[in-house]
Curated annotation (Swiss-Prot):
Zn(2+) binds at residues 903, 906, 923, 926. Binds 1 zinc ion per subunit. A motif ('KMSKS' region) lies at residues 605-609. Its main location: cytoplasm. One of its GO terms (biological process) is isoleucyl-tRNA aminoacylation. One of its GO terms (cellular component) is cytosol. Its EC number is 6.1.1.5. This is Isoleucine--tRNA ligase. Monomer. Its cofactor is Zn(2+). A motif ('HIGH' region) lies at residues 58-68. It comes from Shewanella sp. (strain MR-7).
Length: 940
């Protein structure tokens, strides 16, 4: 054989079987950076239709986690696939840089502002800390193979962006959406600040649940309303609450106008009590109170009790019964304790009745000095003292520890309170913002589509947006208010424009350094500067204007797509929608795509305490970024995304299948120069034409899946193509032709041309997902080409050919089915030790007329399709008794061991081996391929 080995076309490539991604990817990244790859892509798309995916900024604090990786990889897949589709798709990553978490980190290092360090110095420290965090996260994102303008990202703390945030607010004010009010807001006593809705988490908490009696100021008159005359006992209305600490701020009792309320007399411990309760809750309440007996004396509708007065249980004033739509009978008594300073519903109903918005609680959660009974006590510690006082006053009917879901601060994990404070709000209804936003939601495409109803419900029910915070590190609310009237300066909009220009030069510190007289002149004495900062959700929510609307690479084009985790319906999607609609009357996006959260193999959240955290840095260091990218692409992101070591190892297995296919293609393109060796599609061997046609059809399906953001379908189709159509069929069949045909002959060049077309297409299909591997393949493909696959478009030379009417896709599908049946019988013969490999087999196919016509169409080349040394087709009626039935009624098979000699070069067993004098160990075909013009193949 040694003489003939050198006549074979053995596969050869520098593309290694093992990816060694963890080591090789960083080398590729260095080259991408050195070559200015991102700018090359931008230059290649000048003048093309823009596609703008706007990056929702992660917070500049801490290392990236697997959720960040999912998000950035999904964005990168979209940007790269849109670029392949010919769009100019810039990607400018961003970071959210202001706000409390950074302040807390800096406080740990340098202390609180105004103590050891000035506020100005504190802001500078915050800026430095945020910049360090950005650097760390940026390196991790780049390592994932995400291409973008990493050297010029947008930061909400960039002077220009800070200035644009102020300009955005001035537009909101100009359009009449801002108002100042005293309102109850989520308040964290640890932060000492208001919280946005998105900063609130619900956790279980144990609270005192109490039933409290408010005695009527005129019990006899009230009993008469229930049809009971001359009643001698005190009559009380009973509330149920889990926040006893709010009772000092009680200003009313809310009841439902539609509900029936009963006057109930009950006896407990020998004492008679008369109480008013919702009729449907009477039995439950009597059981709860341990009543020995009870009697309903009368019923009235809630509406009849409006404005009846009741004494506060421990303060020297009385409060009215008022009507509210928020009253339910899910629990409690059907009467709601109403403290307008401590609850949103309470506030709304209180406004209707002109109730005082009392707030006896300070920033730190401690009662103010003038609070009777409880001054200086922390509200949660005061709960027990309130209960004790109620007991002492005879107003406590029941008290129990109650476990319930309660709002907590997402940073401190501590319970929060509702607390009325003077704040700045964007009104949802003054200028019809709610109505406009709901209309814009309908004009937006939500992926998955349930996102639409989710955000609609949130917009329908959300209160006015409190945009002010009492913090140091944030974009200032650059307003002047009158010292006496608290009214905004009449020239606020133009003043803000001037302040924004200063901030653009000097950053937000310019506002705190500003002497009001510089802008207001003599008026300065009448006005004071607002010292509040903006909610950081305003910072990020205005980036469609402050970044996309301002940077030149976006060409003033609106945003096509926002893509974030499903928690952002109430976060970034919401804040962006509110600001954009308030500024322009339009949504800031055309499409909004959400992905689920990552969970472990058992469906649990990632948690350090459970020990199930999978860090992206560990995955890239061990398996490589392409494995992580393949897992992201292959997972249906519309639900929870399950990840574990086992799942990532399965991704690595799938990756190896794709890599091995790419390696086979490259190895068999050895010595192929498309400029001179490419065979026109119409001149190819029929099977090669089929392979190119299949690739063309698959490309259409893959492009469509990319366009619909169905990346798991891309990976499914790719795996199917590599494993079945290529791996188990086409590549298997062509090995013989590739290795043994004449090197320059048509049979081999036809096959190489098909492999070249498939490789050119496939490297583009995988580029958005397996970016490192695609680059590696691209560098080794034959022929003249640009430096990077990422500047290319989908492969245009995949012609969908229809020349083969008789050898259609259906024809080859049938042949594949027949081949699978033959393989089963050959496999059985191998197990029975009747043959070794399939080339030791002679197969006889007994087929009906229709199948016979198909099988004989390709003549002697049928044996190459079946990978046997001989294949004969005979009528089904002639089937011998030893013929094996198959799953096809039209086919029976007999497999026998060949008696012919084995060709030393191609390993086929042929009768002529040993009869050719010059080459006694070869078959005719091999002799032709060595010495003659090369074999002729038409079909396979």
């Amino acid at each position: 054989m040694s003489d003939y080995k050198f006549t074979l076309n053995l596969p050869e490539t520098e593309f290694p079987m093992r990816g060694n991604l963890a080591n090789r990817e960083p080398e590729m990244l260095e080259r991408w950076t050195k070559d200015g790859l991102y700018q090359q892509i931008r230059d290649s798309r000048i003048g093309r239709t823009p596609f703008i995916l706007h990056d929702g900024p992660p917070y500049a604090n801490g290392s990236i986690h697997i959720g960040h990786s999912v998000n950035k990889i999904l964005k990168d897949i979209i940007v790269k696939s849109k670029t392949m589709s010919g769009f100019d798709a810039p990607y400018v990553p961003g970071w959210d840089c202001h706000g409390l978490p950074i302040e807390l980190k800096v406080e740990q290092k340098v202390g609180k502002p105004g103590q050891k360090i000035s506020a100005a110095e504190f802001r500078e420290e915050c800026r430095k800390y945020a910049a360090e965090q950005v650097d760390g996260q940026r390196a991790d994102f780049i390592r994932l193979g995400v291409l973008g303008d990493w050297q010029k990202p947008y930061l909400t703390m960039d002077f220009a962006t800070e200035a644009n945030i102020v300009r955005s607010l001035s537009k909101v004010i100009e359009n009449g959406h801002l108002h100042k009010g005293v309102k109850p807001v989520h308040w964290c006593t640890d932060c000492g600040s208001a919280l946005a809705e998105a900063e609130v988490e619900y956790e279980d908490k144990t609270s005192p649940a109490i039933d409290v009696a408010f005695t009527a100021t005129d019990s006899k008159a009230l009993a008469a309303q229930f049809g009971v005359s001359d009643y001698s006992h005190p009559v009380a209305m009973v509330i149920w609450t889990t926040t006893p600490w709010t009772l000092p701020a009680n200003r009313a009792l809310s009841i439902s106008p539609e509900l029936d309320y009963s006057l109930v007399e009950f006896v407990k411990d020998g004492a008679t009590h008369a109480v008013i309760l919702a009729d449907v809750l009477v039995e439950a309440c009597m059981t709860r109170y341990g009543a020995e007996s009870h009697n309903v004396l009368g019923k009235v509708k809630g509406a009849a009790l409006e404005l009846v007065r009741f004494k506060h249980p421990f303060l020297a004033f009385d409060v009215p019964a008022i009507l509210g739509d928020h009253v339910t009978t899910d629990a409690g008594t059907g009467v709601v304790h109403t403290a307008p300073g401590h609850g949103q519903d309470d506030f709304v109903v209180g406004q209707k009745y002109g109730l005082e918005v009392a707030n006896p609680v300070g920033d730190n959660g401690v009662y103010k000095p003038d609070t009777e009974f409880f001054a200086g006590q922390h509200v949660f510690k005061a709960n027990d003292n309130v209960v004790a006082l109620l007991k002492e006053k005879g107003a406590l009917l029941h008290h129990v520890a109650y476990r319930h879901s309660y709002p907590h601060c997402w940073r401190h994990k501590t319970p929060i309170i509702f607390r009325a404070t003077p704040q700045w709000f964007i009104s949802m209804d003054n200028q019809n913002l709610r109505k406009q936003a709901l209309s814009e939601i309908e004009q937006t495409q939500w992926i998955p589509d349930w996102g639409q109803s989710r955000i609609e419900k949130m917009v329908e029910n959300r209160p006015d947006w409190c945009i002010s915070r009492q913090r140091t590190w944030g974009v200032p609310i650059t307003l002047f208010v009158h010292r006496e009237t608290e009214e905004l300066h009449p020239d606020s909009v133009s003043l803000m424009a001037r302040v924004a220009n200063r901030i653009e030069q000097e950053g937000i510190q310019a506002w705190w350094d500003l002497d009001a007289a510089e802008l207001l002149g003599e008026e300065a004495e009448q006005y004071r500067k607002v010292t509040d900062t903006l909610d950081v959700w305003y910072d990020s929510g205005s980036t469609f204007a402050s970044v996309v609307g301002a940077r030149p690479e976006f060409h003033g084009h609106g945003v096509d797509l926002y893509l974030e985790g499903s928690d952002q319906h109430r976060g970034w999607f919401m804040s962006s929608l509110m600001i954009s609609t308030a500024m322009t009357g339009k949504a800031p996006y055309k499409q909004v795509l959400t992905h689920g959260f990552t969970v472990d193999g058992k469906g649990r959240k990632m948690s350090k305490s459970i020990g199930n955290v999978i860090a992206p840095q560990q995955v890239t260091n061990k398996l490589g970024a392409d494995i992580l990218r393949l897992w992201v692409a292959a997972t249906d992101y519309s639900g929870e995304m399950t990840v574990s070591d086992e799942i990532l190892n399965r991704s690595a297995d799938a990756y190896r299948r794709i890599r091995n296919t790419a390696r086979f293609l490259l190895a068999n393109l050895n010595g192929f120069d498309p400029a001179k060796d490419l065979v026109a599609v119409e001149d190819m061997v029929a099977l090669d034409r089929w392979a190119v046609r299949r690739a063309a059809a698959l490309q259409q399906e893959i492009i469509e899946a990319y366009e619909q953001y169905n990346f798991h379908i891309v990976t499914q189709k790719l795996m199917q193509f590599c494993s079945v159509e290529l791996g188990s069929f086409y590549l298997d069949i062509i090995k013989d032709r590739q290795y043994t045909a004449k090197q320059e002959g048509h049979a081999r060049r036809s096959c190489q041309s098909a492999l070249f077309h498939i490789a050119e297409a496939m490297v583009r299909w995988i580029a958005p997902i397996l970016s490192f591997t695609a680059d590696e393949v691209w560098q080794l493909l034959p022929g003249q080409r640009d430096a990077y696959v990422f500047t290319q478009e989908w492969y245009q030379d995949l012609q969908s050919i229809t020349l083969d009417t008789d050898l259609s896709d259906a024809y080859w599908d049938n042949l594949l089915t027949v081949r699978n049946e033959v393989n089963k019988v050959i496999e059985q013969a191998r197990r029975d030790k009747r043959i070794g490999g399939s080339l030791e087999a002679e197969v006889t196919l007994f087929a009906d007329a229709a199948l016979t016509e198909q099988l004989t169409h390709i003549g002697d080349e049928l044996r190459f399709v079946l990978l046997t040394s001989e294949a004969k087709v005979l009528p089904l009626a002639d089937a011998t008794s030893d013929a094996v039935e198959t799953e096809l009624a039209s086919l029976k098979l007999v497999v026998n061991a060949t008696t012919a000699e084995k060709c030393e070069r191609c390993w086929h067993h042929r009768e002529e081996v040993g009869t050719i004098e010059a080459h006694p160990t070869l078959c005719h075909r091999c002799v032709t391929n060595i010495e003659g013009d090369g074999e002729v193949r038409l079909f396979a």
